[in-house]
Each structure stands twice: as structure tokens, then as C-alpha cells.
């Protein structure tokens, strides 16, 4: 009975401490484990199987935080995050690690006017198409760098615009913006925030924003924290889509990134959204809005 209690609470308390309090030896605990599988052991086996399936589905991208709601949802009951973490470590099911590349993508030495920081690190949005972030990132290939321009909707952390090129011309960021505008068709009043790079400060880019009634906001010089959620999204793309890949061509990299963006938007659980995907977060918001409208019409 004592051994079973220790096994049931090993994620919450130190095994050594529990053995001392209950006056049992660790060797006795090990012997008890070697007899017949306890209910806890059987349950752990089932949890590990679910973790393995989830890591296959998400290609090894999930760590303990995202794996916990994933497995809990599959099993239909809450599983302690410490238990998930321990089982992942013991079974070599940990997620991918971050690795950094160094390439300069912000050209702030230009003659274009720089907009003030209207956003002021207020990353909260009450609805879609209120606040967008934009930035450039890059992917190594055997042919050279592939530059990627992204546009992120802050409300659901959804990637709503993207474009790719072997160089960083103004047309690259403008193409990503046009994808976002075509897909989302935002009303006037949206705030568009980016760094102070020439691609975003250029007249053509700002003219498109002005024509749609979009307010321009730019980070302070050299302060990446002013665009932190966008920097985080770029880092996620690097870790989960690039780090463990070897792209021979830019075309290959572009295909994989486009596929990943679809996964990021529709399947990947996001920590800022209560660990649901951007698409699910927006779906729940729309359902709540529809329910509220029905209630007010009664």
C-alpha cells in the first residue's frame, strides 16, 4: 500500500522524502516495482503511447507545455505537466532545441521617414484585424539565403501574410502585405507595426497602408522587444521548421515553409492562446460573438 502511494505521488513529492516519512527503503520500492505492474505503471505506458503519437503528428515540435493539453485532451482527463515532462525525458521524447543564425535583416540607415511607436508594446487585441505585426526572417539553403516576409495578426497570433525571395527588396514585404490584405480585408483603423527597416519605411509600402486607412507604427531603434510577438513567431519558424532541415534549393525551403505556416495556423497550440491553435481561437471567438448577437436579438 505504501509503495503504491509513493508511485502515485512521485510527480508531486521527492521519492526519497516519501520513503523516509513512510519508513520504507528505496530498495524495497524497486523490488515492488519488479513484481507486477502497478496501475500507475500501466497508466504511464498509455500516456507514453499518446505522447509518441503526438510527437509523430507534430514532428517532434512539442515540449512539455504543449504536450500536456494535447495528451489531456486525447485521454479526456487532466494529466499533471510534471508527469508529462518526466515521461518525455525518460523516453527520449523531448522537443527540438533552439539554434540561432546571424543575418542582418533590418536596414535602418535610409532617408525614408520613420513612424512613431504607436503600438507601445500593447500586444493585446480584442478582435481580429486590429493589430498586425510584420518582419523579415531568413532560411539557409545550399543555394544561399531565402528571405521570408511575414505578417502576424496579434489577436490570434495568426500568420496572415507571407512572401519569399532570394533577396530583401521592398517588393518582398509589399507582397506579404498584399497577401494579408487580400485574405483578411481589414476595416480602416488597423495598426500595422514593424521595425524601422527601409522595406517598411519605403513610400510604396506606406502608400498602400495609407490607402487602406491603416495606422503605421514602428519600433524604436535597435529595440527588438517593441516587436516581441513577431520576433517570437520568427524564432518558432526557425526552431520547428528550419533547424533540423537541410534544404538543397530555395524552392524546397519555400514549399516546406508554406506547409508549416498552414500547420502553425490550424494545428499548433499557442501558449498565448491558452494552448489552442490560432484557427481554433478565432473559431471560438466567432462562436461567442454569434451567441452574443443571438442573445441581444431576443
Name the predicted role of every residue range.
Residues 1-298:
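Charged DNA-binding/catalytic regions of mobile-element recombinases
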Amino acid at each position: 500500500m505504501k509503495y503504491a502511494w509513493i508511485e502515485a505521488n512521485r510527480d508531486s513529492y521527492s521519492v526519497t522524502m516519501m520513503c523516509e516519512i513512510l519508513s520504507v527503503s528505496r530498495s524495497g520500492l524497486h523490488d515492488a516495482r519488479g513484481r507486477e505492474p502497478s496501475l500507475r505503471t500501466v497508466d504511464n505506458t498509455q500516456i507514453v503511447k499518446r505522447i509518441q503519437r503526438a510527437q509523430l503528428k507534430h514532428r517532434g515540435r512539442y515540449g512539455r507545455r504543449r504536450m500536456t493539453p494535447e495528451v489531456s485532451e486525447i485521454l479526456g482527463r487532466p494529466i499533471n505537466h510534471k508527469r508529462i515532462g518526466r515521461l518525455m525525458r525518460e523516453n527520449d521524447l523531448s522537443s527540438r532545441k533552439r539554434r540561432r543564425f546571424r543575418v542582418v535583416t533590418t536596414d535602418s540607415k535610409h532617408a525614408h521617414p520613420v513612424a512613431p511607436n504607436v503600438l507601445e508594446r500593447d500586444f493585446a487585441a480584442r478582435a481580429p484585424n486590429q493589430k498586425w505585426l510584420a518582419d523579415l526572417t531568413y532560411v539557409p539553403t545550399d543555394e544561399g539565403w531565402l528571405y521570408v516576409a511575414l505578417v502576424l495578426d496579434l489577436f490570434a497570433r495568426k500568420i496572415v501574410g507571407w512572401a519569399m525571395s532570394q533577396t530583401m527588396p521592398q517588393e518582398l514585404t509589399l507582397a506579404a502585405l498584399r497577401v494579408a490584405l487580400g485574405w483578411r480585408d481589414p476595416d480602416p483603423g488597423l495598426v500595422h507595426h514593424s521595425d524601422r527597416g527601409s522595406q517598411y519605411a519605403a513610400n510604396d509600402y506606406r502608400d498602400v497602408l495609407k490607402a487602406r486607412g491603416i495606422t503605421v507604427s514602428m519600433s524604436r531603434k535597435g529595440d527588438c522587444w517593441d516587436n516581441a510577438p513577431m520576433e517570437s513567431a520568427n524564432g518558432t519558424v526557425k526552431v520547428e521548421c528550419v533547424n533540423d532541415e537541410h534544404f538543397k534549393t530555395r524552392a524546397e525551403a519555400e514549399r516546406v515553409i508554406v506547409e508549416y505556416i498552414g500547420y502553425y495556423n490550424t494545428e499548433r497550440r499557442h501558449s498565448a492562446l491558452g494552448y489552442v491553435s490560432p484557427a481554433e481561437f478565432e473559431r471560438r471567438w466567432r462562436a461567442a460573438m454569434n451567441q452574443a448577437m443571438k442573445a441581444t436579438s431576443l
